[in-house]
Structures are given as structure tokens and as C-alpha cells.
UniProtKB/Swiss-Prot annotation:
Keyword Transferase: no
Name by which UniProt lists this protein: Chaperonin GroEL
Gene symbol of the encoding locus: groEL
Reaction(s) this enzyme catalyzes, per UniProt: ATP + H2O + a folded polypeptide = ADP + phosphate + an unfolded polypeptide
Assigned keywords, A-Z: ATP-binding, Chaperone, Cytoplasm, Isomerase, Nucleotide-binding
Organism annotation: Nitrosospira multiformis (strain ATCC 25196 / NCIMB 11849 / C 71)
Group of enzyme by EC: isomerase
One Pfam family named in its UniProt record: Cpn60_TCP1
GO annotations of cellular component type: cytoplasm
Primary subcellular site in the record, as a coarse category: cytoplasm
Length: 552
């Protein structure tokens, strides 16, 4: 085991605070509408230019191991806030730095770190309660667009495209972001349920212009096994032919004489049909067939539940207003399923999302919810260069997270005003002793910090602006983009309550841990010898991992 170096009390805290300051100072210059850019070196290709706090934080690794510990703990604040709320990373970093800086002064003066932490925790609880009182629901498209614009560093075009996407696929719909091919941002919407399986034979195509099989008001047969024998299918085909409607068959596979018979009937115009493979694999396939059954008001004909293909009736078939089957995808529009059943299914999948441990499973379950709840929207980000594309895409993703958070928990006035307005609730708090009172004071000071930084990044005087904002009430604040005072909500400067709340809670949590830290343990750096050089060289290979994130 390698030898360790241990630092205690003041010298340990001093090193840790240095690390916090280096990381926070690099991140906080990006805060606000006039935030500055940070250029990140890439081991391969051109450097990345960003105004996204968490991207900057993730890049920072310090040479001094003790300073690096402090930096990594603040990095945790940024990435945790980003994971849960999707935005607010820079605000969280600014708050954490302020709480640590102020707190360390009190610790150096001999106050009890545990009592300071208790005071900080009390103040945070009071602030969160006050934020909830200030919060208003975010319902209109205009408000959603405003939240998106602010989060995308005051880009109204991004806000608008996100609001349009949410309007089209609903608040719960899946919205994905990908690289576009032009200079403009584009929005593409897929209505209804779409899955990535196309027709099993091109002879099913009945719309030559679009090269798709289009079925109007079809019956939908769902089967979890392979269909090869036409005898199994005949009874249900006869019933569908009598009803005079088209038929879509979704099964594990359809081949042999069954497929040949369907194709011949289709060409001769006796029965309009189309066959596709069921989406997914294994257990996921069963679940998706069940989803389609609930969406279309049908039943999956499976031996497990005692149903067989030859005894299937029209009552077991699903129905939809329209089905479009392309070469590689099938879209079911306006399924005839019962709304309550669909809602119940969505609730059930949501419960599975809560329990899912892997990101992949969560993503797949989320897709299933979207397909049931109203469709998928695709935002294609346009840009002139690859560097701009990456930066813009990151901002669109941030804005998307922020708008979801706003819809979930509501909105508060932005630009650091909401935190400033909670000061009255915090200043009335009393701790159990003098040290806890000091902890409350630390948070009081930290609540000003985001606004201070926004104003500083604009090149204005923070103290003057803060005093003027404190003279006003409720939504009155300073719009840094236009350098004017007024009602922040009317000016469209809004923050999601969830983002502001998480930024403060995560910042206070990590800062509290730092204040109560009394020893740091790190490996003693190895002497650079003949063998050491080789180890260092191999370490450089770690940079290759970064290539995974590149758009090749």
C-alpha cells in the first residue's frame, strides 16, 4: 500500500478552500445573460467554447491532491444539480463557494463547525419553504418559452422551439435533441405511437408516392409468437374480411405460406393487410406488445393467458384511426384504447422508472411513457460549425431540462431575485446558540451571491444593484440583459423553482461537509524516477476516453 500524506485542521481546510475557489472562479464567470465564455482544450480537434457551468466544472482537475479534493467536492455540487434539475449548476457552485468561504472564517475564529452546520441547515429549510410560497405554476406556452430562453443563455429562438415541442407532444412527451443538417433549428414531430419495425414485404405498399402501407381504421392483431401456418390465421382473416376493414398484424415474425397468402390477398384487393415484426426483444418485446394492446384497445393473443390464434375473435383485436407502415418504422395514430387504461399503464411504467437502476432501462421506459402519452418531438440543432453545434446542443439540452423542471414545480422570478426575496424569512430565524446564529448569517450572505455575480459579469457595481433590488418588493429585480430594473416576471426573466431549490440544497449539503472536515488524506506523490516516467505516459492514455464524447 502506498504511503499517505495527512493534513489536519487549518492547513487541511486552507488547501481545500483553495481548490474550491479555483473551480468556482472558473465556473462563475459563465453566470447570467452576459456571462463570459470559457475555452476548454481538447486532446483531439479544436477546443470547445462554452458558457455551460457544468461543462467547465467537469474539465477541472488540479495538480495538488489536497486542493483537488476541494475542487472535486464542488464539482459534485454542479453535476448533482445538473443530474436532478438539469440546470442551475453555476448558481449551485456560486452558493457553495460563498457558504464555504464565509463558514471557514467562522471556523478559523474558533466557532463549533457542527453548530455552524446546524444553523446553515435551518436557514436552508426556511429558504426552501419561502421559495415554495413565491413559486407560481408554469402553464402557458409563453412562460415555457421564457424559461427555456433564460436557461439557453437568453436565446429566444431555443425557448420558442422547446415551447412548440411541448405544445405538440404534451408536457410528458419525449423530446430528443440531435444534430441538424442546416443552419436553422428544426422541429420534427411524430404523432401517435411509433416503433422501429417496418413492413415484412414491399408488396404491402399501397401509397406509391410515400412508399408506405397506409391503413385507414384498421383492426390490429397482436401475437407474441411466429406465424407461419395460414390455417391458424384463416378464422380471424375471414371475420376481418366480413367487417370490411384492413388488418395490421404485429407478431414475433410472419413468414412462409402465411406471409405469401397475406401478400396475394393484398395484391388482389381481397383484404387490405400489412404484417410487421413486434418491436424490442425478450421481455421488452412482451411489454411493448402489451403497450400497443392498451393503446389500441386490443389483447395480446398469447398462450400464456390461454388465448390461441385460431380462436381469436374481433373483440380481441385492437383498432386505430390510421396506421402508417414504412420501410423501417410503423406509426399507430389515434388508438382506440380506453383513456383510463392508458393512464393506468403510464402510471405503472412511471413506478418502474423510479425503481430502475440503469440509465439505459430508465431511458427505454421513458420512451414507452412518451409513446403512450402523446408522441415524440425531435429538435434538430442547426449551426455553421461543429464547435458551435456542440455548444448550442448543450444549451438546448439545458433549456429542455429547465422547462421540464418549471412545468413540474413552477417558476420564481429569475436573475437571483427569488433567493434575495427569501432573506426576510431567514433573517427572522433564531438558532439555539450563538454559533448556530452565525450559520444562519452565512446563508443570508450566500443568498445575495448569485445576483452579485450576475451583475459583476455585466460589468456593473453589485452592491448598488443589490441595495436597489432590496428596496423593491416581490418580483422587482434587475434585468442584466437590458440593464434595467422592473418586474422580472413581466420581463420574462424566470427560473424554475426546482432548479433554484436544488442548487441551494446541494450547495449547502456539500459546504456543510467541508466545514466539518478536520483531516485530509492523500497518497504521497511518487518521485519521478526511471519507472515513473512510463507510468505517467500511460496515464495520458486516459485522454483517449474523452474521444467517446466526440461526434465523429
Amino acid at each position: 500500500m502506498a504511503a499517505k500524506e495527512v493534513k489536519f485542521s487549518d492547513s487541511a481546510r486552507h488547501k481545500m478552500v483553495n481548490g474550491v475557489n479555483i473551480l468556482a472562479d472558473a465556473v462563475k464567470v459563465t453566470l447570467g445573460p452576459k456571462g463570459r465564455n470559457v475555452v476548454l482544450e481538447r486532446s483531439y480537434g479544436s477546443p470547445t467554447i462554452t458558457k455551460d457551468g457544468v461543462s467547465v466544472a467537469k474539465e477541472i482537475e488540479l495538480k495538488d491532491k489536497f486542493e483537488n479534493m476541494g475542487a472535486q467536492m464542488v464539482k459534485e455540487v454542479a453535476s448533482k444539480t445538473s443530474d436532478v434539475a438539469g440546470d442551475g449548476t453555476t448558481t449551485a457552485t456560486v452558493l457553495a463557494q460563498s457558504i464555504v468561504k464565509e463558514g471557514m472564517k467562522y471556523v478559523a475564529a474558533g466557532m463549533n463547525p457542527m453548530d455552524l452546520k446546524r444553523g446553515i441547515d435551518k436557514a436552508v429549510v426556511a429558504t426552501v419553504e419561502e421559495l415554495k410560497k413565491l413559486s407560481k405554476p408554469c402553464t402557458t406556452g409563453k412562460e415555457i418559452a421564457q424559461v427555456g430562453s433564460i436557461s439557453a443563455n437568453s436565446d429566444p429562438e431555443i425557448g420558442k422551439i422547446i415551447a412548440d415541442a411541448m405544445e405538440k407532444v404534451g408536457k410528458e412527451g419525449v423530446i430528443t435533441v440531435e444534430d441538424g443538417s442546416g443552419l436553422q433549428n428544426e422541429l420534427e414531430v411524430v404523432e401517435g405511437m411509433q416503433f422501429d419495425r417496418g413492413y415484412l414485404s414491399p408488396y404491402f405498399i399501397n401509397n406509391a408516392d410515400r412508399q408506405i402501407a397506409l391503413l385507414e381504421s384498421p383492426f390490429i392483431l397482436l401475437h407474441d409468437k411466429k406465424i407461419s401456418n395460414i390455417r391458424d390465421l384463416l378464422p380471424v382473416l375471414e371475420q376481418v374480411a366480413k367487417a370490411g376493414k384492413p388488418l395490421l398484424i404485429i407478431a414475433e415474425d410472419v413468414d412462409g405460406e402465411a406471409l405469401a397468402t397475406l401478400v396475394v390477398n393484398n395484391i388482389r384487393g381481397i383484404l387490405k393487410t400489412c404484417a410487421v415484426k413486434a418491436p424490442g426483444f425478450g421481455d421488452r418485446r412482451k411489454a411493448m406488445l402489451e403497450d400497443i394492446a392498451i393503446l389500441t384497445g386490443g389483447t395480446v393473443i398469447a398462450e400464456e393467458v390461454g388465448l390461441s390464434l385460431e380462436k381469436a375473435t374481433l373483440a380481441e383485436l385492437g383498432q386505430a384511426k390510421r396506421v402508417e407502415v414504412g420501410k423501417e418504422e410503423t406509426t399507430i395514430i389515434d388508438g382506440a384504447g380506453d383513456t383510463q387504461n392508458i393512464e393506468g399503464r403510464v402510471k405503472q411504467i412511471r413506478a418502474q422508472i423510479e425503481e430502475a437502476t440503469s440509465d439505459y432501462d430508465k431511458e427505454k421506459l421513458q420512451e414507452r411513457v412518451a409513446k403512450l402519452a402523446g408522441g415524440v418531438a425531435l429538435i434538430k440543432v442547426g449551426a455553421a460549425t461543429e464547435v458551435e453545434m456542440k455548444e448550442k446542443k448543450a444549451r438546448v439540452e439545458d433549456a429542455l431540462h429547465a422547462t421540464r423542471a418549471a412545468v413540474e414545480e413552477g417558476i420564481v422570478p429569475g436573475g437571483g431575485v427569488a433567493l434575495l426575496r427569501t432573506r426576510s424569512a431567514v433573517s427572522n430565524l433564531k438558532g439555539d446558540n450563538h454559533d448556530q446564529d452565525a450559520g444562519i448569517k452565512i446563508v443570508l450572505r450566500a443568498l445575495e451571491e448569485p445576483l452579485r455575480q450576475i451583475v459583476a459579469n455585466c460589468g456593473d457595481e453589485p452592491s448598488v444593484v443589490i441595495n436597489k433590488v432590496l428596496e423593491g418588493t416581490e418580483n422587482f429585480g434587475y434585468n442584466a440583459a437590458s440593464s434595467e430594473y422592473g418586474d422580472m416576471v413581466q420581463m420574462g426573466v424566470l427560473d424554475p423553482t426546482k432548479v433554484t431549490r436544488y442548487a441551494l440544497q446541494h450547495a449547502a449539503s456539500i459546504a456543510g461537509l467541508m466545514l466539518t472536515t478536520d483531516a485530509l488524506v492523500a497518497e504521497v506523490p511518487k518521485e519521478e524516477g526511471a519507472g515513473g516516467g512510463m507510468g505517467g505516459g500511460m496515464g495520458g492514455m486516459g485522454g483517449m476516453g474523452g474521444m467517446g464524447g466526440m461526434d465523429m
